[in-house]
Amino acid sequence: NVEEFINRFKDRANAVKDRPMPPIGGDERMQFMKQAELDYQDYMIISDSEFEVTDEYLIFKYKLDN
């Protein structure tokens, strides 16, 4: 079910956004924060996309000026 798939990505995006910072500092902290931002962005792109099934392919469409 594609709707459930999309909802799981929304849940993942929210989980990344709300995930607590582990007790790390310096470069590791910056790397963790950067990865969290990328994870959130990736999950939101999928969850905000329109989709269609064409010739047995699941196709996501994301408007770039979102």
Task: Write out the residue ranges for each language-model feature.
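Compositionally biased, non-globular sequence tracts
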Residues: 1-66
